[in-house]
Amino acid sequence: MRKIFTLLFCAASLATGLAQQESYFTNPVIHGDVADPSIIRIDQTYYITGTSSEWAPYYPVFTSTDLVNWQQTGHVFDEKPEWTKSSFWAPEWYQHKGKVYVYYTARKQSDNISCIGVAVADSPTGKFKDHGPVVEFGKEAIDAFILEDKGKLYISWKAYGLDNQPIELLA
């Protein structure tokens, strides 16, 4: 009887020790295609979105509390915004004054030129309201990045056809 008790005690101790070990992960932690990812942390939750190209719904949203275990919780847009045609690329999260913004690239229906639009919601999993294009520049404007410095907001982006020109600060 004592041998059985000792064996059960050792098995329980081993199981407890294994359960307390750190969990390891292997890449990718999100399976599938999440190109041009953007990640934001709000409170204790991380949110990631990425390029969806031509596939609807547009810009998938995944959530995680540990950066290892991710769940898809929705999309920025279920339907494409009216002004857009295609090429739904490079969404960029930004949080400001209690709102969540997504700056994104899409081609306009009117002239097939890519530009940067913005959508706003109360949370990354909320219903986003599209506000249309905010950057239309030259042949195309893509890949927005938002920066706040000393209370001022700046946006940077890539523009085609400017290969041999210096970086400019536009006001």
What function would you assign to each model-found segment?
Residues M1-E22:
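Bacterial Sec-dependent N-terminal signal peptides
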